[in-house]
């Protein structure tokens, strides 16, 4: 942006947007510029074709807009939460590995997932008889129902769906129902944010008690890049303190401007034994060969492959996330000297 324009702007409050008026350089198409200010060190600028909704629910700032690069986007508290151009990649990666791993998922719990795309992916499985979606923000869900049909594709109206507007942890505390698969698709663990209590050991212990034998949990695993991997590693350690098998995987989600992490947690599923051919057969048997846009056996196997430094990081001991205790990142991995002798067996798998 021109320095003289930037100098005249008021300071940006954290987790908010600042909107420029239409940009005359874009040939009079009325484009609006939005600055994403969710990172304390970087800001990202987006050209918006059209703003469909801008406002605040009880819980968060919301912007739904059409963009030039990512088509329609949902932005929450100053960051892109989901984009039409790549939401199917993200949601397939979050949901389908757990659903494919379970032989016959019948009862599924979704915590978060307000856009409805997580629900859409769950309901793609004919075996599902009940999909309970618990999202704290009723207003956001209604906005997504109105403006983000490409995401939910009518899933909210499926008779198998039970939609509840309440805190996911409170729901588990009051309802003793058991589930075959649980999908956690909540916003990042911002300090003092409503989702913070959904990332702790105590929450996962409660969640574990609501799984049937053979159950699988899939978790949105935060940014998982070389510049920001410690929160994911802490989340993986926390899950390992409760579940016998925890496996990280990641993929680049373009609209997130980073690699993104996911986790599978259970007491039985070892993804190291997965074969691409077996995954392809499960997809064809459970969904049909043309259902998924992105996922197949080769790609999913590749998502679990980590570089040597990341394997070392994930194998390190460290604190887990606890109720009421802020997360403090350990020293950078570059500050730790390591070689083959220091690489634990877990890090070599």
Swiss-Prot record:
Q: Where is the PABS domain?
A: 29-267
Q: Catalytic positions?
A: 185 (proton acceptor)
| Localization of this protein | Cytoplasm
Q: What is this protein called?
A: Polyamine aminopropyltransferase 2
Residues the record lists as binding S-methyl-5'-thioadenosine:
60, 135, 167-168, 194
Q: What does this protein do?
A: Catalyzes the irreversible transfer of a propylamine group from the amino donor S-adenosylmethioninamine (decarboxy-AdoMet) to putrescine (1,4-diaminobutane) to yield spermidine.
Q: Name the gene behind this protein.
A: speE2
GO MF annotation: an example: spermidine synthase activity
């Amino acid at each position: 942006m021109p320095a003289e324009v930037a100098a005249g702007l008021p300071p940006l409050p954290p987790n908010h947007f600042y909107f420029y008026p239409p940009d005359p350089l874009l040939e009079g198409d009325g484009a609006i510029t939005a600055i994403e200010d969710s990172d304390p060190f970087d800001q990202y600028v987006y050209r918006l074709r059209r703003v469909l909704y801008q406002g605040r629910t009880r819980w968060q700032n919301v912007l739904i807009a059409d963009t030039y690069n990512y088509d329609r986007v949902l932005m929450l508290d100053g960051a892109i939460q989901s984009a039409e151009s790549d939401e199917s990649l993200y949601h397939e990666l979050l949901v389908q590995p757990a659903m494919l791993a379970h032989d016959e998922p019948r009862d599924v719990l979704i915590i978060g997932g307000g856009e409805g795309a997580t629900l859409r992916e769950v309901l793609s499985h004919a075996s599902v008889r009940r999909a309970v979606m618990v999202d704290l923000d009723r207003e956001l869900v209604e906005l997504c129902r109105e403006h983000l049909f490409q995401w939910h594709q009518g899933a909210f109206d499926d008779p198998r769906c039970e939609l509840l507007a309440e805190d996911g942890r409170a729901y588990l505390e009051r309802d003793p129902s058991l589930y075959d698969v649980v999908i956690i698709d909540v916003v990042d663990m911002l300090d003092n944010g409503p989702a913070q209590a959904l990332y702790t050991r105590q929450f996962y212990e409660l969640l574990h008690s609501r799984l049937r034998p053979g159950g699988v949990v899939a978790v949105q695993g935060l940014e998982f890049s070389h510049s920001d991997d410690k929160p994911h590693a802490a989340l993986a350690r926390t899950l390992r303190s409760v579940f016998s098998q925890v496996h990280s995987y990641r993929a680049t989600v373009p609209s997130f401007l980073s690699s993104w992490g996911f986790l599978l947690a259970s007491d039985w599923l070892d993804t190291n034994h997965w074969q691409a051919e077996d995954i392809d057969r499960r997809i064809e048997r459970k969904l049909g060969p043309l259902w998924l846009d992105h996922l197949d056996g080769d790609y999913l196997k590749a998502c679990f492959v980590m570089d040597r430094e990341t394997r070392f990081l994930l194998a390190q001991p460290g604190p887990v996330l606890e109720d009421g205790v802020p997360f403090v990142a350990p020293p950078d991995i570059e500050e730790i000297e390591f070689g083959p002798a220091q690489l634990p067996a877990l890090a070599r798998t």
